């Protein structure tokens, strides 16, 4: 996922959800502004919610916001004015907790029966081809730019991969395991590509922006882990993208004033390759490095209790340990690649056709070689070579997708929309589409809402509900990010962080006491 992370990595979406249809745009804006004012006075000049993090009406002598005067504390104190101002955000929190309750009911109770997974290659292919055909005929849109790897294109790429990834889980389509590994590698590639593009071009290393990225990757999964008592690594996409995002961020943050130097960027990438090699391939280093984080990154499958708790994290993170660096490389050379494809576009028709034909021929030969050499390997053998070869199919796809102006200028909107919610669909599938029943259980069964003799109708109903809820989670995550993670006031951000930590500690103590009492 999406999960995900600038570029095609982890889209933030609109800063304020457009889902609150029962209110006018002015009412929505006023409510969010008032709520933010209870956290810190809104910047009346810009009117931008992301800037609404200035000084509160009640501040200390130095102009800094007092902890007791932030909106959350005033709400806890029963301040009617603060509660009224925060009504939309409180409604968002209430909706979030209701969704978590739905997760619990579907996956931890016997309210709905479980169904057995059944794979039909014919049905699997038919679903995807039908969706793709509909997308091509009904939702083909022109991009805002014809640049290679533009935002719409990467969202589309994530979208169709996510559809296949989810169908793979739903039907247990083990025969496409190697393809799924490549899809996940492509997501990780986008982490390197998107984050490098953002930090290298915009040079925005602010704590606020970084915190918003961490919120996007981890906010919802944290609540799911708490509500369902699951380990963080069960949703391995989230910690994996978080780790590689941290690598990209800090590698560019160090000596950031020299990031305009090609030699410095090359040196940083070489250092990253060496670092990754040492961590994952020198025996013992991984264990020592991540030992302090074992409390967070350990995972025990109930069906395999004797496996080392850190094995899952080592395996998952190690499969794609290099490809995010390749994403950084691609982002760095992207301007030259864009200049090349535009140079080809400007050639006379005859010359352009020859060049594009040559590109397609070489790319096709490379694809055939990769397929017959690596893709056809059995699962375990493929896993061994995957970390070193996943960049090949990614490059092949990029070249095919961008070889002509027409190919770069259009995208399939329905897949683009799917690509925006990859992180949410990834997390939600475990509990309201599939079923595991126990903490840390792998989702080996299906959620059943209809009688067993209607598997196709059950699939359609569950999918409609599941996608709708995932879309709402995406919107809620962004709505709450606006209020809770200010991006221009580090003092206010730190107060919110202190409050959040205190709240989680308090809830943890209360929950432990409740469990002991039961």
Positions of PLM-derived features:
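Long, hydrophobic alpha-helical transmembrane bundles and adjoining juxtamembrane helices/loops
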Residues: 1-3, 7-518
């Amino acid at each position: 996922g999406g999960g995900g992370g600038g570029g095609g990595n982890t889209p933030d979406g609109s800063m304020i959800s457009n889902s609150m249809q029962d209110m006018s745009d002015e009412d929505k804006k006023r409510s969010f502004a008032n709520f933010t004012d209870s956290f810190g006075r809104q910047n009346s000049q810009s009117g931008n919610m992301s800037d609404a993090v200035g000084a509160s009406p009640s501040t200390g002598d130095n102009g800094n916001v007092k902890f007791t005067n932030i909106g959350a504390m005033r709400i806890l104190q029963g301040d009617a004015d603060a509660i009224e101002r925060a009504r939309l955000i409180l409604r968002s929190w209430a909706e979030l907790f209701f969704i978590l309750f739905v997760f619990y009911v579907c996956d931890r109770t016997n309210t709905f029966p479980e169904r057995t997974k059944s794979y039909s290659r014919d049905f699997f292919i038919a679903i995807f081809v039908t969706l793709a055909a509909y997308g091509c005929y009904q939702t083909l849109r022109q991009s805002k730019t014809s640049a290679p790897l533009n935002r719409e294109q990467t969202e589309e790429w994530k979208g169709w991969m996510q559809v296949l990834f989810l169908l793979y889980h739903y039907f247990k389509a083990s025969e496409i395991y190697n393809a799924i590994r490549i899809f996940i590698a492509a997501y990780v590639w986008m982490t390197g590509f998107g984050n490098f593009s953002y930090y290298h071009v915009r040079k925005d290393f602010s704590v606020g922006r970084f915190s918003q990225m961490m919120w996007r990757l981890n906010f919802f999964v944290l609540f799911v882990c708490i509500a369902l008592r699951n380990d963080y690594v069960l949703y391995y996409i989230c910690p994996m993208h978080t780790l590689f995002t941290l690598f990209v961020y800090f590698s560019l943050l160090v000596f950031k004033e020299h990031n305009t130097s090609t030699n410095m960027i090359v040196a940083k990438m070489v250092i990253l390759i060496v670092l990754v090699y040492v961590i994952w391939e020198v025996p013992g280093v991984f264990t020592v490095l991540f030992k302090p984080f074992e409390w967070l990154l350990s995972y025990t499958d109930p069906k395999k209790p004797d496996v080392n708790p850190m094995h899952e994290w080592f395996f998952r993170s190690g499969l794609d340990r290099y490809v995010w660096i390749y994403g950084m490389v691609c982002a760095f050379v992207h301007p030259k690649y864009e200049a090349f494809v535009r140079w080809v576009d400007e050639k006379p028709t005859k010359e352009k056709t020859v060049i594009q034909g040559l590109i397609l021929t070489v790319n096709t030969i490379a694809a055939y070689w990769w397929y017959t050499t690596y893709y056809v390997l059995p699962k375990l053998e493929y896993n061994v070579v995957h970390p070193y070869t996943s960049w090949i199919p990614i490059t092949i796809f990029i070249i095919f997708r961008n070889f002509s102006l027409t190919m770069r200028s259009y995208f399939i909107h329905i897949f683009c929309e799917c690509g925006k919610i990859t992180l949410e669909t990834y997390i939600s599938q475990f509990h309201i589409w599939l079923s595991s029943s126990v903490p840390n259980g792998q989702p080996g069964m299906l959620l059943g809402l209809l009688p067993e003799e209607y598997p196709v109708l059950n699939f359609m109903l569950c999918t409609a509900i599941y996608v709708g809820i995932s879309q709402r989670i995406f919107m809620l995550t962004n709505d709450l990010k606006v209020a809770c993670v200010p991006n221009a006031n580090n003092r206010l951000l730190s107060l919110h962080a202190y409050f959040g930590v205190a709240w989680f500690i308090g809830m943890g103590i209360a929950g432990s006491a409740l469990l002991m009492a039961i």
